[in-house]
UniProtKB/Swiss-Prot annotation:
Protein's gene: coaA
Protein family: Belongs to the prokaryotic pantothenate kinase family.
Molecular function as annotated in GO: ATP binding; pantothenate kinase activity
Source domain of life: Bacteria
Pathway: Cofactor biosynthesis; coenzyme A biosynthesis; CoA from (R)-pantothenate: step 1/5
Source organism: Streptococcus pneumoniae (strain ATCC 700669 / Spain 23F-1)
Catalytic activity as recorded in UniProt: (R)-pantothenate + ATP = (R)-4'-phosphopantothenate + ADP + H(+)
Protein name: Pantothenate kinase
Binding positions (ATP): 91-98
InterPro entries referenced in this protein's UniProt entry, alphabetically: P-loop_NTPase, PanK, PRK/URK
This protein's record includes keyword Isomerase: no
């Protein structure tokens, strides 16, 4: 165990699954298939063993937050205002953050009857490609400077205060922000914020993004495994783009497969791996829970902050 994990409790999958009574997963195999990322692997057994105990833990944190807010209201002699419970989900590109986030959205909406659950990805806070080109940092897309962190902080502040917010929409198919398109995020009981940068700090350091989170999750895996999943995802994106000239990946379908694999590997080394090692992984210990995946995508270890 490294110093990074000294303030975490390491829990095996077997022990973790015993922390919650066995119940039938509140979703079908078809629903699970529809929400998983197309290069990810997850089963109903994973839902039972990992995610139902996780949802129960979130329930504990939510109850604790509400009790504290009530007690503070008594101390301040004023009525406490209801706020959304905000969950941050971080991790590398291609590690399975989106699957985890979408699954949590379903589980929370069905665990808490009548609860509303919004899901937001920080991809929408990337600067448009044209802006990145003008700033000379298109090749740094995904790195901290390519995000409008002030806009992200403003969004979190407004959501925390119960306001509805419209935010930009990013398309992986066109590899850019979609002009004129917005996602309307309503003031909800739960808001899940997913992205590689959700534990990072803006350069001015006046506010910490993690200050807005009531619970936080980091999806982790070995670097070699993540690289394999990234390359697999890249090639699968090509298969989807074969008949779509508007797709960012279409141009790669016209290239020899060897050149494509070489290009994808270079992107991994120069961008995604560098970003992971320098900016994403160093924020891992800011999470309340770390879900570690093995080579076959199965979560084998859980780290819970003490």
């Amino acid at each position: 165990m490294t110093n990074e994990f000294l303030h975490f409790e390491k829990i095996s999958r077997q022990t973790w699954q015993s922390l919650h009574r066995k119940t039938t997963p509140p979703l079908t195999e078809e629903e699970l298939e529809s929400i998983k990322s197309f290069n990810d692997q997850i089963s109903l057994q994973d839902v039972t063993d990992i995610y139902l105990p996780l949802a129960h833990l979130i329930q504990i944190y939510k109850r604790t937050k509400e009790d504290l807010a009530f007690s503070k209201g008594i101390f301040l002699q004023r009525e406490s205002k209801s706020q959304p419970f905000i969950i941050g989900v971080s991790g590398s590109v291609a590690v399975g953050k989106s699957t985890t986030s979408r699954l949590l959205q379903i589980l929370l909406s069905r665990t808490f009857t009548d609860a509303t659950v919004e899901l937001v990805t920080t991809d929408g806070f990337l600067y448009p490609n044209q802006t990145l080109i003008e700033q000379g940092i298109l090749n740094r897309k995904g790195f901290p400077e390519s995000y409008d962190m002030e806009a992200l902080l403003n969004f979190l502040d407004r959501i925390k205060n119960g306001q509805d917010v419209d935010i930009p929409v990013y398309s992986h198919e066109v590899y850019d922000i979609v002009p004129e398109k917005k996602q309307s995020v309503k003031a909800a009981d739960f808001v899940i914020v997913e992205g590689i940068n959700v534990f990072q700090n803006p350069q001015n350091d006046r506010l910490y993004i993690t200050d807005f989170f009531d619970f936080s999750i980091y999806v982790d895996a070995g670097v070699d495994d993540i690289e394999s999943w990234y390359l697999d995802r890249f090639l699968k994106m090509l298969s989807l783009a074969q008949n779509d000239p508007d797709s960012y990946y279409y141009r790669f379908t016209q290239m020899p497969i060897g050149e494509v694999e070489s290009f994808a590997h270079q992107v991994w080394i120069s961008i995604n791996l560098t970003n992971l090692q320098n900016y994403i992984e160093p924020t891992r210990n800011r999470a309340e829970v770390i879900l570690h995946k093995s080579k076959n995508h199965e979560i084998d270890e859980i780290y819970l902050k003490k």
